[in-house]
């Protein structure tokens, strides 16, 4: 019996001319144990990743069924190699399966894009805790509330807490160095603990009430505030009673405006609804945290029809012996919706927060999936298929949201594909698959020659590809020389492409857009000729009169006459979209680089100030401006700064 984790050798590249894959011999060697299997084609590319409670039974089902759908039969015909990994349990198989799906993106699996982590609202561990937006790994040091479906949902909750409880949002360095209240105190959004305008005890109570509100204990918080108001009134402290009364009024307004879960029910709930149309799908995830509906987020899977057909085979093969099953049409929308929902739950929650309750639009049949989620969460996870009351209303909202998001997505895809086609025709690119049109666009950004940066943004598959964007720090040029900057970035980018071509792994775009006119295009042409690349790929985007959108001119490096497309051109709309994204990406990087240089460079120039001392100074005085405003005596109070060094710092900065 193979031990857990045992796996077959990696997939070799198989010559298609060799004998067909001997499935029978391979299946005979498989164990009847839980595990994960991978199918590979003759080129070694992964076709499908699946899990099984019985590897032998599952894999053999693909090769013994006589009524396979055309899509499954097509995949099976491509199988040239199988790898398997034995695990200890079905839960382990589920986890490994979804990790492999995310890593390998197989052609026949339903895939959801691995989104960045969800945002949280954080209350810091401080004598006067700070309320902050947070995205990333959580720890036990601070309090985290969420996750939230979007940054907007976090900031909306922060605005509510600022209005009702007036918690601070400033950085600790700012808090430690304030001598008078900020504007937020004047507009009644902060109680100014920085200048002791509120006692530590009262501020702690406000923090506790805010946390209770976020955790869904709205009635308890309301009662606490009412008791506090009555105590102030009984003590004839009418001004304080009026302040608490205003808090109660603001909180009542919030609770009236938002749908709140009934008392006694779980206050953290996710609502999942699936919509399908024309081979496309949307999963709409609505989040309820602390009994409050925070909004929703739409997810759009790929490989929908191929993946759903094969998932159906997997589910049927995994039914225990003796259990009755009803055959379903491979393209049945209800079955596809269930398969898509199960794929989303598996891929989404196995590394995310799992709420106690999932309200779903379709049943979840996958054996062991909910058990695995419960084991991960360390508590019971309930799945509600036919909710009542507020949950029913939330599910109906989520279902409508899924339908609207899918309709909008299909409409956007149609218009974006039309723009891609128009650009290809305008520039003269001949492609059978428009999704393969790869466009790279370059822009240079600086302020009077300072902090020069170049950006490269990428467009393909009818969309901007943020994960492939690159920034380049431009060095060793005359400040403000945009031509030299463009030469440097193009040489650095496409020298790498030339080197990759020698290894048969080029990543060459079909169009290279340059934000500039004839001068910039001429520089690009020289670089491409030096590297032996096709200058026909180069297109400059020259700004029109008054820099108005729609008046741009396309400038070609290969001698073709310049082209003015006009404001109504679909091709120009796409060019402008890509060019503007390159400009945005470059300018944000340039600003960050410039700010960093201005905040640290003057301290770096002072002898005796290393990284640690510089960090202590900036933290103590809240930035370079605070350091410059400090006296010699104040500078000398910082750890590691002697009286002599403090005098030198003061002299250098003044």
UniProtKB/Swiss-Prot annotation:
Organism of this sequence: Ralstonia nicotianae (strain ATCC BAA-1114 / GMI1000) (Ralstonia solanacearum)
Major site of localization recorded for this protein: cytoplasm
InterPro entries to which the protein is assigned, alphabetical: GIY-YIG_endonuc, GIY-YIG_endonuc_sf, GIY-YIG_UvrC_Cho, Hlx-hairpin-Hlx_DNA-bd_motif, RuvA_2-like, UVR_dom, UVR_dom_sf, UvrABC_protein_C
Annotated protein name in UniProt: UvrABC system protein C
Matches recorded under Pfam families: GIY-YIG (PF01541), HHH_5 (PF14520), UVR (PF02151), UvrC_RNaseH (PF22920), UvrC_RNaseH_dom (PF08459)
GO cellular component terms, A-Z: cytoplasm; excinuclease repair complex
Limits of the UVR domain: 219-254
Annotated localization: Cytoplasm
Description of how the protein assembles with itself and partners: Interacts with UvrB in an incision complex.
Keywords: Cytoplasm, DNA damage, DNA excision, DNA repair, Excision nuclease, SOS response
DNA damage found in the keyword field: yes
Highest taxon of the lineage: Bacteria
Gene3D superfamilies referenced in this protein's UniProt entry, alphabetically: 5' to 3' exonuclease, C-terminal subdomain, GIY-YIG endonuclease, UVR domain, UvrC, RNAse H endonuclease domain
GO biological process, one term: nucleotide-excision repair
Family the entry assigns: Belongs to the UvrC family.
Function: The UvrABC repair system catalyzes the recognition and processing of DNA lesions. UvrC both incises the 5' and 3' sides of the lesion. The N-terminal half is responsible for the 3' incision and the C-terminal half is responsible for the 5' incision.
SMART domains given in the database record: GIYc (SM00465), HhH1 (SM00278)
GO molecular function, one term: excinuclease ABC activity
Sequence ranges assigned to domain GIY-YIG in this UniProt record: 32-110
């Amino acid at each position: 019996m193979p031990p857990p984790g045992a796996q077959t050798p990696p997939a070799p590249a198989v010559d298609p001319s060799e004998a067909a894959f001997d499935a029978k011999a391979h299946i005979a060697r498989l164990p009847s144990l839980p595990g994960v299997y991978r199918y590979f084609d003759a080129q070694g590319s992964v076709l499908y990743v699946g899990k099984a409670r019985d590897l032998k039974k599952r894999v053999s089902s693909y090769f013994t069924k006589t009524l396979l759908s055309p899509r499954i039969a097509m995949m099976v015909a491509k199988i040239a190699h199988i790898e398997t990994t034995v695990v200890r349990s079905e839960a382990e198989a589920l986890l490994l399966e979804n990790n492999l799906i995310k890593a390998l993106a197989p052609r026949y699996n339903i895939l959801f894009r691995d989104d960045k982590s969800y945002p949280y609202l954080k209350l810091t561990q401080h004598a006067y805790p700070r309320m902050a937006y947070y995205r990333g790994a959580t720890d036990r040091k601070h309090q985290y509330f969420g996750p939230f479906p979007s940054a907007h949902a976090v900031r909306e909750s922060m605005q509510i807490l600022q209005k009702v409880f007036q918690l601070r949002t400033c950085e600790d360095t700012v808090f430690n160095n304030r001598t008078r209240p900020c504007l937020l105190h004047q507009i009644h959004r902060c109680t100014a603990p920085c200048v002791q305008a509120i006692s530590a005890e009262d501020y702690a109570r406000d923090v506790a009430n805010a946390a209770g509100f976020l955790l869904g204990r709205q009635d308890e918080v309301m009662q606490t505030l009412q008791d506090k108001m009555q105590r102030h009134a009984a003590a004839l402290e009418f001004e304080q009673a009026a302040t608490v009364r205003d808090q109660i009024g603001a909180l009542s307004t919030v609770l009236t405006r938002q749908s709140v879960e009934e008392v006694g029910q779980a206050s953290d709930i996710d609502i999942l609804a699936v919509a399908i149309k024309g081979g496309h799908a949307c999963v709409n995830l609505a989040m309820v945290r602390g009994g409050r509906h925070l909004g929703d987020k739409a997810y759009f899977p790929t490989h929908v029809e191929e993946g759903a057909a094969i998932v159906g085979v997997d589910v049927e093969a995994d039914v225990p012996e003796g259990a009755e099953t009803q055959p379903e049409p491979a393209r049945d929308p209800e079955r596809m919706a269930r398969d898509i929902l199960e794929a989303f739950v598996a891929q989404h929650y196995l590394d995310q927060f799992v709420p106690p309750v999932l309200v779903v639009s379709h049943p979840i049949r996958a054996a062991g999936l909910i058990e695995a989620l419960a084991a991960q969460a360390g508590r019971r996870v309930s799945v509600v298929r036919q909710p009542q009351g507020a949950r029913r209303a939330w599910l109906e909202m989520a279902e409508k949201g899924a339908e609207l998001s899918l309709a909008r997505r299909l409409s956007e895809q149609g218009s974006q594909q039309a723009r891609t086609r128009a650009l290809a025709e305008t520039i003269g690119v001949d492609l059978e698959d428009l999704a393969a049109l790869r466009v790279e666009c370059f822009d240079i950004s600086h302020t009077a020659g300072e902090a020069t940066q170049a950006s490269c943004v990428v467009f393909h598959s009818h969309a901007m590809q943020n994960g492939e964007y690159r920034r380049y720090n431009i060095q060793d040029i005359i400040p403000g020389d945009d031509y030299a900057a463009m030469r440097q970035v193009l040489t650095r980018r496409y020298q790498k492409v030339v080197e990759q071509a020698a290894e048969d792994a080029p990543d060459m775009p079909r169009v290279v857009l340059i934000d500039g006119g004839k001068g910039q295009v001429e520089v690009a042409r020289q670089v491409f000729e030096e590297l032996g690349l096709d200058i026909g790929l180069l297109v400059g985007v020259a700004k029109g009169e008054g820099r108005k959108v729609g008046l741009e001119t396309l400038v070609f490096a290969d001698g073709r006459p310049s082209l003015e497309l006009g404001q109504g051109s679909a091709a120009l709309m796409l060019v402008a979209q890509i060019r503007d994204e390159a400009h945005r990406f470059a300018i944000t990087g340039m600003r960050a680089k410039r700010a960093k240089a201005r905040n640290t460079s003057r301290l770096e120039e002072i002898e005796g100030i290393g990284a640690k001392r510089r960090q202590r100074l900036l933290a103590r005085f809240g930035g370079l401006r605070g350091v410059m405003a400090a006296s010699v005596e104040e500078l000398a109070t910082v750890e590691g700064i002697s009286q002599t060094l403090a005098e030198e710092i003061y002299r250098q900065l003044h």
